[in-house]
């Protein structure tokens, strides 16, 4: 079994990452071509919410074909998959593996670390959250808002704000989606919908993520 410092079980994540590394090895990707990011890495670092799926970011779209179940023996072992030019989603009994074609967008590069039983480049938390806003901010998912609030309240607040200011159009897109969702009575905060998924580090943010996100947006707009 694989546990974080707070005792959270990441055995399923470790198994998924093991599958992913076999797929990468079969595709003969150099170690410099990919990094581990996404919500499960944030969960492991901040102990705020449960997450098990694996997100791997590939810095050159030309590698995506070699990862596809159409050409990769190990990918083909997935129960099912979805694929487009920039993303491959593989479903296993343990959860999902996403291979996403995306370059680094912040000044905080991935660093080699040991995580979930593997030695791999791991994205910086600021990079992870900025990617959420940059690539899918127009949807403002509740879990992304929760992750954003947690990082905003951490020691990385200044780093986060500095990086987000580089992408005003993406921030505006996110802000518009956030305000629309916030005014929709059918859309509730992540901490309300998935209260049972909150870990020790996330319980203090319960019911606060919308307000914290609003504070961040005001700070980015210079109105805080």
Model-derived regions: residue spans:
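Compositionally biased terminal segments of proteins
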Residues: 1-224
């Amino acid at each position: 079994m694989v546990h974080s410092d707070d005792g959270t079980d990441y055995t399923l994540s470790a198994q998924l990452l093991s599958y992913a590394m076999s797929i990468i090895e079969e595709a003969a990707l150099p170690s410099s071509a990919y990094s581990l990011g996404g919500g499960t890495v944030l969960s492991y670092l901040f102990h705020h919410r449960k997450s098990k799926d694996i997100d791997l970011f590939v810095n050159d779209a030309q590698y995506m074909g070699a990862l596809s179940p159409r050409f990769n023996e190990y990918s083909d072992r997935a129960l099912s998959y979805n694929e487009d030019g920039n993303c491959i989603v593989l479903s296993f009994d343990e959860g999902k593996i996403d291979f996403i074609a995306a370059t680094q967008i912040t000044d905080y590069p991935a660093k080699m670390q040991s995580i979930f039983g593997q030695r791999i480049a791991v994205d910086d938390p600021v990079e992870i959250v900025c990617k959420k806003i940059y690539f899918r901010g127009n949807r403002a998912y509740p879990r992304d808002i929760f992750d954003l609030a947690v990082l905003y309240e951490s020691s990385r607040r200044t780093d986060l704000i500095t990086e987000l200011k580089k992408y005003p159009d993406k921030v505006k897109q996110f802000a518009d989606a956030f305000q629309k969702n916030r005014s929709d009575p059918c859309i509730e905060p992540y901490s309300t919908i998935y209260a049972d998924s909150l870990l020790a580090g996330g319980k203090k943010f319960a019911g606060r993520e919308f307000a914290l996100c609003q504070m961040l947006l005001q700070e980015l707009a210079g109105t805080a």
